Every structure is written in structure tokens, then in C-alpha cells.
Amino acid sequence: MVRQLLLVPLVVLPAISIASEAELAAKFGYEHIYLDVGSGTTNKDWLDNSNATTLGLGGNYLITDNWLFNVDYSAQFFHPDDLTLRVDRLLFGGGYRYGINDQLDVYGTYGLGALKAKATDEKTDSTISSDTEFLQAVTFGANYLLNEQWMVSAQIQANRSDVVDENKYRIGFNYQWHDVIGTGLYYQYRDTDYSGESSDYINEVGLSLKFLF
């Protein structure tokens, strides 16, 4: 009887732990689809300080309570003089999340994909140059819940290709005003190095939509 009583906590505690991880994953809204729309300025002289517009689409799917699969797509547009420069990135990856406590959560992911950079003449709509290269990225981030609706997130990503190397630093706020839909604001700093040239940067702000499932 004593032995059976001692075994009860060993059976119950893992169940409690698993339930807690599942609840935390849902609380932080890990299973979601997001849409970002941003705009910013660049210090590139050859772009005449033109604005940069960014679109982002992606999402996460939890394989277990901690391991996740994610997809990220983004498109950047620049319009210097009579040109349109477009940079597309597509990444498929996976990673691990861990709940520190009921309010703080951290994660890390690694992704593989492709990058396409294309320059088009706006007058003739002809392609001036087009390159497609292998892309890989490492991402680390943290989420902090202020309350049940408000969440602050911080993220660092390093992505590498033969066309451009980029380090991104992002901080954002999300308000989950519905069981499914949330909206937010973000600021993002991009430190870029195009084909071995000197480092340049883009300051970017934007709006985000988050759809939980």
C-alpha cells in the first residue's frame, strides 16, 4: 500500500506537466497564421533613400506541446528612380518552444528555403537582373504576456544567402481582442549586407494580424 501511494505522484506529476505545457502553448497562441505589412527607410545611397515596403505571411503548427513547424514568406519592394527591386524569401523550418513561467515563453527555430532578388525596369517592364539562391535562417525569440489580451514579443533572426546576408531585430505588441483574431504593431531593424558590400540598414514599422487556430 505504501509503495502504491509513493507511485501516485510519479504518475500524476508528468500528467500535470504535460497539461501545463499544452495550456501555455495555447495561452501564447503558438498555432497561428500571421500577416505583416510594413514600411521603412533605408540609408542606401544608390537607392536615393527610397522607402522600402515589406509584406510578410506565415504561421506555426505545433507537432507536440514544445516542438513546432513553421513557414515564413516575405517580399520587399524598393522603387529607386525608374526601377523596381524586389526581394522574396521563403523558409520552411522547425524549432522548440519552452515556457519559463505563466507569463514568459522563449523559442528558437531553424529554417531552409530560397531567396529571389529581381530588378525590373518600370518603363519597359523588362527584367534587368534576377537571382535565386539557397537561404537559411536561425531565429530566437521571447514572448511576455502583460495580461490575457496584451503580449510583447522580441525576436532576433540571422538569415544567410549568396545574394544578401541579413540580421533582423524586432519588437512587437499584439492585442488579442477576439478568440481568433489579434492585431498589433511592430518595429524592425534590418542590418543587411548585399553581395559582400558594406553593411546597410532599414528601419521599418508595420501592422500585424494574427489568426489563431
What are these regions (language model features)?
Residues 37-43, 73-79, 98, 112-118, ...:
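Transmembrane beta-strands of outer-membrane beta-barrel pores
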Residues 144, 173-182, 200-213:
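Outer-membrane beta-barrel "beta-signal"
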Residues 32-33, 65-71, 102-106, 146-154, ...:
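Repeated loop/turn-to-beta-strand initiation elements of outer-membrane beta-barrel proteins
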Residues 89-91, 95, 99-159:
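Detector for outer-membrane/organellar transmembrane beta-barrel domains
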Residues 29-31, 49-55, 86-90, 114, ...:
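Residues that define the transmembrane beta-barrel architecture of outer-membrane proteins
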Residues 18-78, 212:
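Short glycine/proline- and aromatic-enriched beta-strand/turn motifs that initiate or cap beta-hairpins
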Residues 43-50, 80-87, 118-129, 156-157, ...:
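Outer-membrane beta-barrel translocator domains and adjoining extracellular loop/strand segments
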Residues 25, 58-60, 95-97, 141-143, ...:
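Transmembrane beta-barrel domains of outer membrane proteins
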